């Protein structure tokens, strides 16, 4: 044993220029001494001194064969002679020594028993110093193989260290036992090295197994070192698969990353921004956006600016389908407290985008877009084009919800101006959304030719079947009364459309057939539509959408039967629709029309008012109430006129309301006014689509 060396060893230790015994020098897994890197070894010892030390070790009678090889192999490794080191290490038969190593480790962990001075430790018991020396030799052998590119063999050698120590310490590394520091250091380096070797060898399964093995027992890893291992395992689980990552792997990675983030929050480990990035990716992959928002809220102040925090949280809530919460967070950036802060560009752009999707928040969207445009020339043309696009959409939505005619006209002009500005700024690389939104806004404002040009341009630029584009084109063609062309486009589109898209197209086709006075064809189309809806597999995400489609299909079929005068069949269809969606304003309006056809005026009024109780601004129901009032006598004409004026305030282009307003004026003896109302109804009907443009 080296610890029982004779004077030969002391003579080696006393040599000039060698302040430490070679047998007791600490060695890191990178092949460097505890004091200096491998590159400093030659500066510490002259070549002649290394040769002399090597010769001395070979002649030292106190070292056994394996220990001498361990020391000689270490010297060769430190000098960069990996082939030579490997040859030396191969002479150590670790399989023969394993039982003695395990026994030595086990005996070291046993509680000390009182013994007489006459008791002598058996000479066959290996000291912990020798155990560490031999295990270090295996580690260096693995390192040598790694340097020579033999990664699989290196991993198998490294695994020996783990097998030996785990057999001796099945419950993990004990605390407070003297003489274990060197052993623990070597073992922990082997724990960290093994998965890296398997990774280099291309064995994904063994890499994961090695990381899990390192985390399965308490090996006294310091918190930061343990965190690095946990992070490495999480990254391999997330990104290591060649194909799609298995669900179990993602879940395990999420648990590991959550633990690490919690440790960061309480200060157990250093802050690592990459952990939040990886957790964001993992939770996004599994759709757990609200959980991600919760972890973002736990991050310490200063990690993100307030703008960044609101932006990230709003992304989470929006992805989770909680747009209202997302918009409320984004609106904080518009408050007076943020006026002195540097504007967060992505936040403003995302705020404008979210608000453009919801007409209720169109005013907030206008504010977001204006804040972005106020930054002026400091932004790219693309960004300014996006800001103008969302501004135009928000102006259009605001116009449709405006109660004042003057304001509505002003907002409509602003909408077209902003969308045209977006198109002009992106002229070099036209954006499809800009062209589409501009076409829709032109259609809503009954600029039918401009809308048609935009719809055709959009469809041609898509370069394939775009259900959204072709559907819009069909509706625009219906506004030009080119109903056959519109139906042909739908037939063409349905050949390539998916099932959900085909449902929307079939519904529009049925409406087109009704407009062409083809009720039997429309009935057949509605039947096909219902069959397609029922054939769909329902999931949590699609169930509500399919239920909405089926409700509308039954209501459409009721309208078809109503056109044919088959009111009992129409009522049956409406009962089916009500069983799926009781609180449907259109359903109650159609029910009222059926009752009105049977001259049940009071019951019809009840149905119409039920519709308005669900949606107070439901224009068809308001017009229906006015029509019933008109039949109740001349004394009800002012009330009917009031309802019709309210309908036109909500929808100024409703030709049906203008027509009935003409009837009211005619009954009141206002012939000139009636003629003007009829003229307005006629002109609006010429450009009226069979289905809303929005």
From Swiss-Prot:
This protein's record includes keyword Repeat: yes
Keyword vocabulary terms for this entry: Calmodulin-binding, Repeat, TPR repeat
Keyword Repeat: yes
GO CC terms: extrinsic component of cytoplasmic side of plasma membrane; plasma membrane
SMART domains in UniProt: TPR
Residue ranges of coiled coil: none
Classification via Pfam families: TPR_16
Chain segments annotated as transmembrane: none
Organ and tissue specificity: Expressed in pollen, flowers, fruits and leaves.
InterPro entries hit by this protein: NPG1-like, TPR-like_helical_dom_sf, TPR_rpt
Region span, Disordered: 12-40
Placement of TPR repeats on the sequence: 32-65, 66-101, 135-168, 188-221, 307-340, 551-584, 585-618, 620-654, 655-688
GO molecular function, one term: calmodulin binding
Assembly information from the UniProt record: Interacts with calmodulin in a calcium-dependent manner.
Record's protein name: Protein NPGR1
Species the sequence originates in: Arabidopsis thaliana (Mouse-ear cress)
Lineage: Eukaryota, Viridiplantae, Streptophyta, Embryophyta, Tracheophyta
């Amino acid at each position: 044993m080296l610890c029982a060396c004779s004077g030969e060893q002391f003579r080696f230790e006393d040599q000039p220029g060698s302040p430490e015994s070679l047998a007791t020098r600490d060695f890191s897994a990178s092949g460097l001494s505890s004091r200096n890197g491998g590159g400093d070894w030659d500066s510490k010892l002259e070549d002649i001194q290394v040769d002399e030390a090597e010769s001395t070790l070979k002649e030292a009678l106190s070292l056994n064969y394996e220990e001498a090889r361990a020391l000689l192999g270490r010297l060769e490794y430190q000098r960069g002679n990996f082939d030579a080191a490997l040859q030396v290490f191969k002479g150590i038969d670790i399989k023969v020594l394993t039982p003695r190593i395990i026994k030595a480790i086990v005996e070291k962990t046993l509680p000390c028993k009182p013994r007489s001075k006459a008791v002598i430790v058996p000479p066959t018991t290996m000291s912990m110093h020798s155990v560490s020396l031999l295990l270090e030799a295996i580690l260096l052998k693995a390192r040598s193989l790694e340097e020579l590119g033999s990664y699989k063999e290196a991993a198998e050698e490294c695994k020996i260290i783990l097998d030996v120590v785990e057999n001796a310490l099945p419950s993990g590394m004990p605390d407070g036992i003297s003489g274990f520091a060197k052993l623990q250091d070597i073992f922990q380096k082997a724990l960290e090295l093994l998965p890296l070797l398997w990774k280099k060898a291309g064995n994904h399964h063994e890499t994961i197994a090695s990381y899990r093995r390192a985390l399965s027992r308490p090996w006294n890893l310091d918190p930061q070192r343990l965190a690095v291992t946990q992070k490495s395992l999480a990254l391999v689980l997330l990104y290591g698969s060649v194909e799609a990552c298995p669900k179990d792997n993602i879940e395990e990675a999420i648990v590991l990353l959550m633990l690490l983030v919690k440790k960061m929050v309480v200060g157990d480990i250093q802050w690592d921004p990459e952990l939040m990035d990886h957790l964001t990716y993992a939770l996004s992959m599994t759709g757990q956006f609200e959980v991600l928002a919760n972890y973002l809220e736990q991050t310490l102040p200063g990690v993100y600016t307030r703008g960044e925090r609101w932006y990230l949280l709003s992304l989470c809530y929006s992805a989770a389908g909680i747009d209202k919460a997302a918009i409320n967070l984004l609106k904080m950036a518009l408050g007076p407290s943020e006026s002195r802060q540097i504007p967060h560009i992505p936040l403003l752009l995302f705020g404008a985008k979210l608000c453009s999707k919801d007409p209720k928040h169109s005013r907030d969207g206008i504010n977001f877009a204006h804040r972005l445009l106020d930054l002026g020339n400091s932004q790219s043309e693309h960004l300014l084009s996006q800001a103008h696009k969302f501004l135009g959409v928000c102006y259009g939505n605001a116009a449709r919800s405006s109660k004042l005619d003057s304001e509505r006209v002003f907002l409509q002009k602003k909408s077209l101006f902003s969308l045209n500005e977006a198109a002009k700024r992106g002229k070099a690389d036209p954006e499809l959304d800009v062209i589409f939104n501009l076409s829709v806004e032109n259609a809503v404002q009954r600029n039918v030719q401009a809308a048609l040009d935009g719809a055709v341009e959009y469809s041609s630029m898509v370069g394939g079947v775009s259900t959204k584009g072709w559907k819009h084109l069909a509706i625009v063609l219906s506004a030009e009364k080119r109903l056959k062309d519109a139906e042909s486009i739908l037939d063409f589109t349905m050949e390539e459309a998916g099932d959900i898209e085909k449902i929307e197209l079939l519904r529009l086709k049925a409406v087109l057939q009704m407009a062409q006075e083809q009720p039997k064809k429309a009935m057949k189309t509605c039947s096909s539509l219902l069959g397609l809806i029922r054939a769909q597999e329902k999931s949590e995400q699609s169930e509500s959408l399919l239920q909405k489609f089926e409700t509308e299909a039954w209501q459409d079929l009721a309208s078809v039967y109503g056109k044919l005068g088959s009111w009992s069949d129409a009522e049956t269809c409406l009962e089916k629709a009500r069983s799926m969606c009781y609180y449907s304003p259109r359903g109650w309006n159609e029910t009222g029309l059926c009752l009105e056809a049977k001259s049940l005026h009071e019951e019809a009024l009840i149905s119409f008012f039920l519709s308005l109780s669900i949606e107070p601004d439901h224009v068809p129901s308001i017009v229906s109430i006015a029509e019933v009032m008109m039949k109740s006598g001349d004394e009800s004409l002012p009330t009917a006129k009031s309802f019709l004026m309210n309908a036109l305030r909500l929808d100024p282009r409703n030709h049906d309301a203008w027509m009935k307003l003409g009837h009211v004026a005619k009954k009141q003896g206002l012939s000139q006014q009636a003629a003007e109302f009829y003229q307005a109804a006629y002109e609006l009907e010429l450009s009226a689509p069979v289905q809303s443009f929005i």
